[in-house]
Amino acid sequence: MYRPAISRPRVLLVVSHPSVGAAIETILRLERRYEVRRAAKLAEAVNLARSWPADLALVDALVLRRDGRAELGAPALILAGGAAEAAAAERSVDNPQGWVAKDAPSADLVAAVEHLLTGSLTTEAGSLALFGIGVLVLVLAGLLLYLIWIAVV
């Protein structure tokens, strides 16, 4: 299967609850960094993984407990209510790489996905972005000093 050299990472989301799945899919799509496909059942996810190779599978522990073992062909991040549930679910996927709490803030969920995809714990600003922030700080400081000078004179 052809994949362009420059593409967005593919995330396969496996969550059976429609509202929860839609919410997580929306969070990931709002980042505009990922291609996201969602499956409600494990069998559907396995079929999707064959035709659409994902870079990461984000899998609800409840789906694994109900549907059994899965060969998704991608590193799996488990959505679980706690460490015990995550440990049990990790035995059901072929390449478990950790877990994230179901009640985690969206920033933590995105950070966990990003960490597995890039190996980096945080996304860092580049030197141009830092330069821009420095220029803005200097301009704002200059404006503040100007306003103080006008108020005094």
Regions of interest found by a model, annotated:
Residues L121-V153:
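C-terminal single-pass membrane-anchor helix
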Residues G68-G73:
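Short, conserved loop/helix-junction motifs that constitute active-site signature segments
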Residues L79-A125:
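Output/docking surface of receiver
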Residues Y34-A40:
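Short hydrophobic/Thr-rich beta-strand motif most characteristic of the beta2 strand and flanking loop
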Residues L58-L62:
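Active-site residues of response regulator receiver
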Residues A40-L56:
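Acidic, metal-coordinating helix/loop segments flanking the phosphotransfer/catalytic sites
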Residues M1-A5:
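Short boundary motifs at domain starts and secondary-structure transition points
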Residues R8-S19, I24-L28:
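Conserved acidic segment of CheY-like receiver
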